[in-house]
Amino acid sequence: MDEIDETELIGVLRAGGVVQGAAGGGLRSVPAELLRRCCHQLRDQVDPRGLRLSQVAVTGGLDLAGLTVPFPLRFDECEFDTAPVVDGAQLDELSLTGCPRLPGLLGNGLRVRRDLDLSRSQVAGALWTSASTSRTAAI
């Protein structure tokens, strides 16, 4: 699996483009830690149109807990190794659309200024959360 590196990712995000991950019948990958860096340390380099990924495999755990992200986060037809964590985050927008294997979403205390969109995504996961002490939840 071909990996999207920081130089390529930042170049597309500065230009306000969409990171395309489809390659030769498979998906290119991006490390979750790099996406966190873009939302935290490198956020001043991201165009106001936001972080937009299409058909990308996000590898590792995407942990945006407690972050304030002033631009939209849009994942279209992306795959995730683990459930994204957005506990206590303040996001402008979060869109996880058409994701074929979304292992859940941990978002206790999440604040979204605009839209939270999970259209066409298949959520398959049971997660323990502090908000539900007697059951598991997918979201």
Q: What are the roles of these predicted feature ranges?
A:
Residues M1-I139:
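N-terminal leader/targeting and pre-domain segments
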